[in-house]
Amino acid sequence: KRQEEVQGMPYEVTLTGVGKINATRVLTEKIVMWDGRKPMLPDIVINYGTAAKCSNRVQVGELYEIGSYIQRDMNVTQLGFENYQTPFGKGTINGGKGDLICATGDNFWEGDTQFTEEYDVADMEAYALASVCETYNIPFRCFKYISDDGDAKQWQENCRKGVELFIARMRLNA
């Protein structure tokens, strides 16, 4: 959301753009140049975004805190790796106070005909942000507003509602 929409809150807002590469690039640049002169790690990174409903543990129209992150578009099982496991890298990243699993991928999740038991929500940035925070040992919290169940039209209609819920939640914690 735009800076002017969160005035009065003690957080600096950074827009990362859509997708894992944008999220990684923008957050890493922000960390490396935190105060404009030298690297200075933030006390915490808080992510807000929308997500698709992938399990019956979440409901469209609600805001949830996420606790674990996987890459849903990483599949090299043919090479002997577990699904969602990056070869010689990270698999599941744990962090945050929630117990839900967010599956990040660089495509719009369209699973409205069948839910999964493997993860609860799908987005396009959280795993990347959690990975950067893990690399720099920065606490990471992630809040996802369930905007749809794999339906792009639902997403467009519901985005604004999620921002309002998130801002209210942050004001309680400020």
Feature locations, PLM:
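N-terminal beta1-alpha1 ligand-phosphate binding loop
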Residues: K1-Q3
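Glycine-rich phosphate- or other oxyanion-binding loops that anchor nucleotides, phosphorylated ligands
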Residues: E5-A174
